[in-house]
Amino acid sequence: KRDAPHIILLPEIIFNQKKFLLKGQDVIAQKGYCVIVASEGIKNNKGNFLSESDTKDAFGHAQLGGVAPYLSSLVSKKLKLKNHWAVSDYLQRSARHIASNTDLLHAEAVGAHAIKYAISGMNGVMPIIVRGKGKKYTWKIEPAPLSKIANLEKKLPKTFITKDGLNVNKQAIDS
């Protein structure tokens, strides 16, 4: 049975500081530790990102970054607990040696198809991984129009989120 993460803070759910701290205390009381995963896109009850900066991306969206130190500071100040945070995108960039074979196959196929599309003159598309039907994992690469991807977001279905809003449920894990 999976143990961690114990709390997952999702952008689909408004961050509730009190609920977050109470859940953290409860998990620590039970297990002696608590692992938290947080999206940079989580917002407070005023609709502001917890980690928003003044910098904007190419689409005019707020540049995010800093939710981990924000939560770390909150836990330190409110719960008086030592804690550690890490930004996982650094791990992805520096740990190719522990990538799964599937990840490597996906990366190579996406890159090869991007080159193939460019050489053949396809514009306004990007390669995407399309999962096959059935229990056995199969996949293929297809072109997708950038107009259906760029500057859009796909939200996690509410049916995948626990009632307390602090994790994903079995349906999310199994799908």
PLM region spans:
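C-terminal non-catalytic interaction/assembly regions of soluble proteins
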Residues: E52-S175
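Accessory alpha-helical/coil subdomains and C-terminal extensions
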Residues: K1-H84
